[in-house]
């Protein structure tokens, strides 16, 4: 097994010669992870990492192990001789065992760490269930800003989500909405001016915003992200939770269609929404009931079809995934 894995700043070639030995190399840097069956720990051996932060080193090591073992359900324990001298700068949310001199985390917790994938500041408001509480939302992101970025080893490409900027992205929205296969489900074909007005209205709506998906910086998809309580799906989502999220999706660039890509971007947009606000416990969708291909993709990514219901303009499937389901199953596809 051999593929590329990125730290926050550098690409490393990962080689797994056997299940108990993982090697990461980049220029003069070399990281060796060796599994010790007797202690159930991974030993870290470093060379050339003097200029890399301890948190970045540990995250790279954990990431590599979870790439090689994507369904691992046990705690991963890293044994590193230098960890005691570095503990003062340790900010990664991992368990530090001072007595044993090791750090540990499980896969479910690891994928809920926002950095390095989230580029925008995540909400840090605490979860509250008080009656008549003021609903506090993160502000909509600045148009054109990168929200999420992650290297995908299976594709050898970088996936990113960018907040829609009308001047920069209107051309893609206009082209994609006028494709017959998109118009069939979205019903938003129209002129340049009509689409400009549509996106301007969206930009002024505090409950929703547009997102452009890119592979290697090439736009391929459009998403609309929304808060469920303020959306038209709310009456059907009872009992809805204050911080439920949802999204609409279309893949407009035909070069980036295919069953090998859908699980990647579908799990990644879900990942982004759960990371964006730790109070979010559910992500919901309402695809048209005859969009069976997309519904099946959602089910394959551990979404549940809860019911069918009628909007004025369509019959829809109510699709749901909880935070626990997402992170306890696979998390984002790699």
From Swiss-Prot:
It is an enzyme of class 2 (transferase). Its main location: cytoplasm. One of its GO terms (molecular function) is N-acyltransferase activity. It is found in: Cytoplasm; Nucleus. Substrate binds at residue 248. SUPFAM superfamilies: Acyl-CoA N-acyltransferases (Nat). GO terms for cellular component: cytosol; nucleus. The active site is at 286 (proton acceptor). It comes from the Eukaryota. Keywords: Acyltransferase, Cytoplasm, Nucleus, Transferase. This is Putative lysine N-acyltransferase C17G9.06c.
